Regions:
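Short alpha-helix boundary/capping and kink motifs at helix termini
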Residues: 51-109
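Amphipathic, charge-rich alpha-helical segments that serve as recognition/docking helices
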Residues: 134-175
Length: 175
């Protein structure tokens, strides 16, 4: 599917509903500029999402099954897995064996990290897999406001939204 079209599908009533993808995008940019980047805003987002999110690292599951302490915090494991994905994507590109999952309306369900990397590398096309559901996660700017992100983080996020809108030629028309 065309990347810009897929991104446009993430606007619901003129509001970008997958700001979590932009936090990942911002983190990719910062990390590739400086390998010592601390992933602060990303870690905060992951911490605040973890109880809503069904995702639990395989490492954590294995540790729990073996009645051992997990090999690091959820946030540390999220960053480690993210760095591995960034490296793999940089080296090999998008692995089409792992398409981005979306609902029947084209709303992102699973694959926000891969979508952020696709946006970073400005791919023309991305592989998607449609799932027969209308369910959609909601991570609009309101979610970040309601979860107490700092003014500095909100400035970063709003700037990334503006850059994204420019990239897809979004002009606040009714979507």
């Amino acid at each position: 599917m065309d990347l810009k079209t897929f991104i446009r599908n993430q606007f619901i009533e003129n509001e970008f509903n997958r700001v979590d993808m932009l936090v990942r995008y911002h983190s990719i940019k910062e990390y590739l500029l400086d390998e010592n980047y601390n992933f602060g805003i990303y870690k905060e987002m992951q911490e605040k999402r973890k109880f809503r999110n069904k995702y639990i690292s395989r490492n954590i599951l294995e540790s729990l099954a073996n009645k051992q302490e997990p090999p690091g915090s959820f946030e540390e494991l999220s960053v480690s897995n993210f760095k591995t994905l960034i490296s793999s994507f940089k080296e090999k590109g998008f692995d089409s064996a792992h398409p981005i999952r979306c609902n029947e309306n084209g709303n992102l369900l699973d694959g926000s990290h891969r979508l952020a990397l696709s946006y970073f590398y400005k791919l023309d096309e991305i592989p998607v897999f449609n799932i027969s559901t209308t369910r959609q996660p909601k991570y609009s700017i309101k979610w970040f406001e309601e979860n107490g992100f700092s003014d500095k983080d909100m400035l970063i996020i709003n700037n990334e939204i503006d850059i994204l809108k420019n990239y897809i030629n979004f002009n606040d028309e009714k979507i």
